[in-house]
A protein has these predicted regions:
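Predominantly soluble domains enriched in secretory-pathway, periplasmic, or organellar proteins
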Residues: 1-241
Length: 241
């Protein structure tokens, strides 16, 4: 296989925003921002199996561990949709904060955490009841509340710690998952968006959209090691380690 070359294309709806991959079922689930739909794509046949209507500007997509249920955010609708992955239809909606963006699920399967960018909060959803069970607010030192625009979040495999990017506030929040208390803030670059952990969870990588760089953080000390210049307006980050 040639690296840095296009090896194929898959069908989606208009303006695909984010996606989730189910390797076992060979399905790709794509949020189409301008189409206000979720495309369920059969990878092997390269066809759209279902086109699921959603609220306006869908973005975040998450698959349940058993592959049967999808969760999709609608930024304009302030909604999280629960979708039947096989049947291709919305089962239930829950209202969250303003402009919901991304997800993380607790490893025990009990909770779904959702960033609400313009509310400056993370909403916690009880998956059994599919209802909001709490929310977490953020305010790093020296920042205005209006600067806090959370987008990305990631949890450690043991489910004990969550990291949340705070957008214009230029920090990453460290949250104790069980108590939902903020343990600290890490200064990063301008408009922190995407975030991921290294495989051994020793480092965090944060895309700074207005800084044109990626900040690498030592997870143990909770301090930035270096910020690496990249292309313009980096948005997401994936580590192949």
């Amino acid at each position: 296989m040639l690296f840095r070359s296009v090896v194929g294309k898959l069908a989606t709806g208009p303006s695909p925003e984010t996606f989730a991959l189910d390797e076992r079922r060979r399905r790709l689930y794509v949020a189409n921002e301008e189409g206000s739909t979720l495309s369920i794509v059969d990878i092997d046949q390269n066809i759209i199996v279902h086109e699921v209507p959603t609220g306006a500007e869908p973005e975040g997509v998450l698959i349940s561990d058993d592959g049967k249920t999808l969760y999709v955010t609608s930024e304009v609708g302030d909604l999280v949709h629960m979708v039947d992955a096989e049947g291709g239809h919305v089962v239930q909606d829950v209202v969250v904060g303003t402009r919901p963006r991304r997800f993380a699920a607790t490893p025990d399967g009990k909770e779904l955490w959702v960033t609400a960018e313009l509310s400056g909060e993370v909403y916690v959803i009880d998956r059994a009841r599919f209802a909001v069970s709490g929310k977490i607010e953020f305010l790093p030192p020296g920042m205005r509340k209006t600067d806090v625009t959370p987008v990305g979040l990631v949890m450690t495999r043991d489910g004990k710690t969550a990291y949340v990017t705070l957008g214009h506030a230029a920090h990453v929040a460290v949250v104790d998952v069980s108590s939902r208390r903020i343990q600290g803030y890490i200064l990063v670059g301008k408009r922190s968006w995407g975030i991921t952990l290294s495989r051994d969870e020793s480092k965090l990588f944060v895309a700074n959209g207005f800084g044109d760089d990626v900040t690498i953080i030592d997870a143990k000390s909770r301090k930035a090691i270096v910020s690496v210049p990249v292309g313009r307006i980096p948005w997401g980050v994936v580590i192949d380690d």
